[in-house]
């Protein structure tokens, strides 16, 4: 294990078994973390922390594993799975309040490496999609870029 205490070899194995694809893991550290000294050791893990455009990285990814980052919502808009890995959850919530909406996020959560590999192994896309759909309906702040069309339709109805 290394960066973020993730067992990258185990993750690669479980992703390859689950999705039947060759896997590369792109690792992007928080901007406040000096990632230049971190050696990921696995040739299938690539440190992309210095890549300037996170949107490009999201477009090239099939799945996201993140923690408390709002990037999870951006990635959800791409209709791709997000998994939350929260090994420091207890200390994190003791140090700072989470957004009220965090507990409502529809993403599978893991607090340990073994849990993370289990939720990936047991992942069912249809159940995940339904949770995301219900979240989108419930969260009135959520927008899929159709606000102008919806507004015009509302005006026409009046």
Predicted regions and their residues:
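C-terminal alpha-helical cap of glycosyltransferases
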Residues: 144-158
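A generic local structural motif
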Residues: 11-14, 50-53, 70, 95-96
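Conserved catalytic-core segment of nucleotide-activated headgroup transferases in glycan assembly
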Residues: 1-39
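Donor nucleotide-activated moiety binding/catalytic core segment of transferases
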Residues: 26-73
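Soluble or luminal CAZymes and related metallo-dependent hydrolases
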Residues: 3-11, 53, 143, 147
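Catalytic binding pocket for nucleotide-activated donors in carbohydrate/polymer assembly enzymes
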Residues: 39-41, 70-140
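Alpha-helical elements of Rossmann-like donor-binding domains used by nucleotide-donor carbohydrate transfer enzymes
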Residues: 10, 14, 115-118, 150, ...
């Amino acid at each position: 294990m290394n960066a973020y205490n993730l067992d990258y070899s185990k993750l690669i194995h479980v992703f390859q078994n689950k999705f039947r694809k060759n896997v590369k893991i792109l690792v992007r550290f928080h901007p406040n973390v000096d990632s230049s000294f971190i050696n990921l050791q696995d040739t299938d893990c690539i440190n992309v922390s210095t890549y300037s455009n996170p949107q490009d990285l999201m477009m090239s990814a099939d799945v996201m594993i993140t923690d408390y980052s709002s990037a999870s919502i951006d990635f959800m808009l791409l209709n791709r799975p997000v998994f939350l890995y929260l090994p420091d959850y207890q200390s994190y919530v003791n140090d700072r309040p989470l957004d009220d909406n965090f507990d409502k996020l529809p993403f599978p959560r893991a607090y340990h490496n073994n849990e993370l590999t289990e939720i990936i192994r047991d992942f069912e896309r249809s159940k995940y999609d339904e949770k995301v759909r219900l979240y989108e309906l419930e969260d009135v702040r959520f927008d899929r870029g159709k606000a102008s069309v919806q507004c015009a339709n509302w005006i026409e109805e009046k």
